[in-house]
Amino acid sequence: MSHSPTPLAAIVLAAGKGTRMKSQKAKVLHEVGGRPLAWFPTRRALEIGANPVVAVVGHQAEAVEAALAATLPGAPLRFAVQREQLGTAHAVLSAREALGRYQGAVLILSGDTPLLRAETLSRVVAARAGATLSLATMRLADPHGYGRIVRDPAGTPARVVEEKDATDAERALDEVNAGLYCADAAFLWEALSKVGSANAQREFYLTDLVAMAARAGGVVAVPVPPEEASGVNDREELARAGRVLLRRRASELMRSGVTIEDPERFDCDEGVEIGADAVIEPNVRLKGRTRIGAGCRLGAGAILTDAVLADGVTVKPYTVIEEATVAARAILGPFSRLRPGSDIGEEAHVGNFVETKKARLGKGAKANHLTYLGDATIGAGANVGAGTITCNYDGEKKHPTTIGEGAFIGSDSILVAPIEIGAGAYVAAGSTLTESVPPGALALGRAKQVTKEGWVARRKAEAQNKGAAEAAPAPSPADSPRGGRAS
């Protein structure tokens, strides 16, 4: 993290609606990498030491404020409301009160630029030291829609002209404004007070500051890659930005010792942590505050949300883990589901089509097949057979199930909570238990088996005889003992 050596504040412009998103939600609330768009420039400004950072909000102001406060807890954030959308200069001026008596450099950036790097912001801030204003520029093969950079005969930026106000010659220019500026606060407020709206859109353009700064003491242009500075205006651009962020993240992780088998099929939110020597198979999705320990292996199609995995955990394909904790060397899946509150112990096994919810499995405990464990505590070394169900809900309340260390639960057992199976106890397959079982005991909760030898043959013979009788023709009246004429 590179901090500015001089006082630095930042203003993030996040007031617009974003009509091209075709959404009821404000543009800057749309997410990439599990974060709202406005989070990215705000976070990058914080990374280079900006304090405070003022977010100018407008459309859905309360929701934008809440999203930034929730995703940047404890950060020196302030908020300013632009009640009327009168242009970018008006938006920046809306932040003046929030900055109070602050004197120093002010970095201005757009809230829809998730690809900006902290290093780029630092370059723009550093460039201002030799001028009244610094701004980022980029060269585009198709500059349509962007403000063009007009330079003087000496090659110094003289002004920015917006697309709708440009002449044909100016529209032919390929150097455009990237919407990232740095200026001294004193100059900024004085210049903004002089900006007018005599332009094609009748708006107060922030870009008018460039001409004012050129006259006051000079402007420095800082070239930046188009990929980095381009804003997000619609869903296609949102998706493209997301892929760029994922490629960056995959590259960063691989350089730190993580194996990602196919970086093009890797999906990871901002803030996810992955330890060295972890292996990520294709189509894994890592969300929220997930933490992956060293040496873990995540199988294809696994989805982890706010999960914490210790070192050496194996997650087989298509396992879903949400708000669960998994200890070292545990084995999960394939096709298992760990719901919130699950706590899986060291070397425990949770196998295919097993679902856990608020369940704790001790060291080496196993539930390998077709099982539901809800509100359950499973002791170390216990084995839960296929098809076992903990019936934790009575229609009104949840109840706990406790299975002691070394206990053995036979297949297709139903444990009706609240219930406790003692350490080392056995439950016979197919049992339905409603009472606790003492340690070391065997519990059978099923009907007694009855075997009837020869029953199948007798049943088949009866069926055949019945079928033959039903198929025989009915007797005619003449054949009846009462059917003839009396003599």
Curated annotation (Swiss-Prot):
Residues 236-256 are annotated as: Linker. It is found in: Cytoplasm. Its EC number is 2.7.7.23, 2.3.1.157. Pathway: Nucleotide-sugar biosynthesis; UDP-N-acetyl-alpha-D-glucosamine biosynthesis; N-acetyl-alpha-D-glucosamine 1-phosphate from alpha-D-glucosamine 6-phosphate (route II): step 2/2; Nucleotide-sugar biosynthesis; UDP-N-acetyl-alpha-D-glucosamine biosynthesis; UDP-N-acetyl-alpha-D-glucosamine from N-acetyl-alpha-D-glucosamine 1-phosphate: step 1/1; Bacterial outer membrane biogenesis; LPS lipid A biosynthesis. Residues 453-487 are annotated as: Disordered. UDP-N-acetyl-alpha-D-glucosamine binds at residues 13-16, 27, 82, 87-88, 110-112, 147, 162, 177, 233, 339, 357, 372, 383. One of its GO terms (cellular component) is membrane. Residues 468-481 have a biased composition (Low complexity). It catalyses: alpha-D-glucosamine 1-phosphate + acetyl-CoA = N-acetyl-alpha-D-glucosamine 1-phosphate + CoA + H(+); N-acetyl-alpha-D-glucosamine 1-phosphate + UTP + H(+) = UDP-N-acetyl-alpha-D-glucosamine + diphosphate. GO terms for molecular function: glucosamine-1-phosphate N-acetyltransferase activity; magnesium ion binding; UDP-N-acetylglucosamine diphosphorylase activity. The active site is at H369. Residues 257-487 are annotated as: N-acetyltransferase. It is an enzyme of class 2 (transferase). Gene3D superfamilies: Hexapeptide repeat proteins, Spore Coat Polysaccharide Biosynthesis Protein SpsA, Chain A. One of its GO terms (biological process) is peptidoglycan biosynthetic process. Binds 1 Mg(2+) ion per subunit. Residues 1-235 are annotated as: Pyrophosphorylase. Mg(2+) binds at D112, N233. Acetyl-CoA binds at A386, N392, Y393, S411, A429, R446. Homotrimer. Catalyzes the last two sequential reactions in the de novo biosynthetic pathway for UDP-N-acetylglucosamine (UDP-GlcNAc). The C-terminal domain catalyzes the transfer of acetyl group from acetyl coenzyme A to glucosamine-1-phosphate (GlcN-1-P) to produce N-acetylglucosamine-1-phosphate (GlcNAc-1-P), which is converted into UDP-GlcNAc by the transfer of uridine 5-monophosphate (from uridine 5-triphosphate), a reaction catalyzed by the N-terminal domain. NCBIfam families: glmU. HAMAP family: GlmU (MF_01631). This is Bifunctional protein GlmU. It comes from Anaeromyxobacter sp. (strain Fw109-5). The gene is glmU.
